[in-house]
From Swiss-Prot:
One matching Pfam family: GATase
Subunit structure: Heterodimer of HisH and HisF.
Keyword Kinase: no
UniProt function note: IGPS catalyzes the conversion of PRFAR and glutamine to IGP, AICAR and glutamate. The HisH subunit catalyzes the hydrolysis of glutamine to glutamate and ammonia as part of the synthesis of IGP and AICAR. The resulting ammonia molecule is channeled to the active site of HisF.
Main location, first listed in the record: cytoplasm
Biological processes annotated in GO: L-histidine biosynthetic process
Protein's organism: Streptomyces coelicolor (strain ATCC BAA-471 / A3(2) / M145)
Residue ranges of domain Glutamine amidotransferase type-1 in the record: 15-222
The protein's name: Imidazole glycerol phosphate synthase subunit HisH
Pathway terms, separated by semicolons: Amino-acid biosynthesis; L-histidine biosynthesis; L-histidine from 5-phospho-alpha-D-ribose 1-diphosphate: step 5/9
Signal peptide: none
Cellular compartment(s): Cytoplasm
């Protein structure tokens, strides 16, 4: 599968900033986004992060450490400001986890960005970490997984996850977030599409053709 080159009506490649706050596979993300047709830059520069068509927030390591690094780089403020203006943001792996209310790792609790209610906790499975390829169950109307077969597999490497989704708008004028699930022992949230904010627990940049199509789908919405 070859990813199409997304561009606006003018043919300009979409500008995507991979936010460099010290906790993420920034080079892998840069290469994957470039292959998907984006004009990519790795930076923590405030103006560039704010003005890009899309902002990608990667994340590896401990929840609390990632939050500290993000705050030190003013990334928490940048994410909030972009979302307040309807500007697209995508989180990957721990970059998704920190979008929730809090994380608990080794009995250490840390506050997240609280864009979504929920707690990141240990995987409830016989084998931890969850490392390798797995399928997902995406909503039928998912934009993120558009064009992908139901048996498409994505690459995961994590020991913590969100096992319950509790956000409900109760407002018929507001679209409910699209939540995608995967299972390792117990079902967990594998991806979320919520207006301008999308995120995946797995690594699309390491997920071969399926990951390339997913990133293309995101870029085409920018």
């Amino acid at each position: 599968m070859t990813a199409a080159v997304p561009a606006g009506a003018t043919g300009r490649a979409k500008k995507v900033v991979v936010f460099d706050y010290g906790f993420g596979n920034v080079r892998s993300a840069e290469r994957a986004l470039a292959r998907a047709g984006a004009d990519v830059e790795i930076t923590r520069d405030y103006d560039k992060a704010m003005n890009a068509d899309g902002l990608l927030v990667p994340g590896v390591g401990a929840f609390a450490a990632c939050m500290e690094g993000l705050k030190a780089a003013r990334g928490d403020w940048i994410v909030d400001r972009r979302l307040s203006g309807g500007r697209p943001v995508m989180g990957i792996c721990v970059g998704m986890q920190i979008l929730f209310s809090r994380g608990i790792e080794h009995d250490v609790e840390a506050e997240g960005l609280d864009e979504w209610p929920g707690t990141v906790g240990p995987l409830e499975a016989d084998v931890v970490p969850h490392m390798g390829w797995n399928t997902v169950e995406a909503p039928a109307d998912s934009q993120l997984f558009a064009g992908l077969d139901a048996d498409a597999r994505f690459y995961f490497v994590h020991s913590y996850a969100v096992h319950e989704w509790t956000q409900e708008s109760h407002n018929p004028l507001i679209a409910e977030p699209r939540v995608t699930w995967s299972t390792h022992g117990k079902p967990f949230v594998a991806a979320v599409e919520n207006g301008a904010l999308w995120a995946t627990q797995f690594h699309p940049e390491k997920s071969g053709d399926a990951g390339a199509q997913l990133l293309t789908n995101w870029i085409e919405t920018l």
